[in-house]
Amino acid sequence: VSIVSKVCAYTNHTILAEALEKWPIGFLEKAVPQLMPIIRELDNRVRAKVSDESTYIIKDGLVHMAHMDIHYGYSVNGVAYLHTEILKNSELNNFYKLYPEKFNNKTNGITFRRWLMSCNPELSAMITDLIGDGWKKDANELEKLGNFVNDDAVLDRLLAVKAGKKADLKNYLKMKQGFDIDENSIYDIQVKRLHEYKRQQMNALYVIHKYFEIKEGKKPATPITVFFGAKAAPAYIIAKDIIHLILCLQQIINNDPEVSPYLKVFMVENYNVTMAEKMIPACDISEQISLASKEASGTGNMKFMLNGALTLGTMDGANVEIAELVGNENIFTFGEDSHPVIDRYARGDYNSRSYYEKDSELKRAVDFIVSDTVKSVGCSENLERLYNELLNKDWFMTFPDFEDYIATREKAYAAYTDRKDWAKKALINIEKAGYFSPDRTIEEYNQDIWKL
């Protein structure tokens, strides 16, 4: 135990209960019988010194792996500032009271070699032309791009690079999946694991809202292409129902001659790293719309930022740090922050139907899920199950944020029409992305935890 406690450190990557391993004692006694006496002894030592039952390793017939990590590791860290604060003040508060000295933050990073140099050589070349190639070894040198935010020639070149990547994605998806994409449209992209907390369902409800607006004659100033890319866990039924809805919307909207010149929806097949390398450099608006308090950090938000996309997001995960870095005028934030969300969960009084009844735009969008129009191209069972889930549960609180989401998304689309100012915002995002270098992350881990 003495050796383990000096060697092992715990990094928490999620607060979702489903991802914090808890193994039935009976299963472990069959699978690893040689380990159970050790686990019981570790638990007994905790019980001898701690009175708070919620922190015990063996509880309710389950072995709580995270509890073991915290008691016997020498460090506990979250992976974004907000995430770590939530661990300390909410999710792991009982442990924080026991071991405040163990808790620290290490904000995630992304590899620039993959997510800029490899996937966007045109932007990499532009950056090198402007500030030299020192940024490839020291990402903080991207700050030098701040000298060019008012340089029209640089902004024009940045727009040209983005236009080229948008054309590349258009051609790639035409070849691979037969999609007919308007490269002059706004590329609004949400690509990530399909999970209710990431709220692809809220994005889909906005698409329905926009569909109705266009049908009523309210056409956007710039055409919009909404891209989804995601996979659902094999047994995650509601996630698959959300994919089903998106595919229904793709079929309805893209084949409607009144709507498709102004709005199209594409769910890319088999979303993976190869696809991400095509989509991220082409993105104009990066959808990072998780329910505040649920995304530990996120790294897609960093990849999009690095490639000059603007974030449309909640104040969750690393979005909080992105907003601090780029300034409120260079990011589009909306929705409740983590405090009212955590309080509402604690009270257990969230009623999605009350929001549905008082917001006519929300009600119309939700009802469309089970309309004859959607059922004519989809499966009633999937659609009704999703409809009932939203109306009677909506565990990740899509409805409270919906009105602000619409308003902020419209604000982002309006900002896009000023191309020079948009390019300035994009360049500022690239300039500030150096903080999310993995070199900085790893250096902090080494200084504070590993001490190699």
Located regions from the model:
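A conserved ligand/cofactor-binding region detector
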Residues: V1-L452
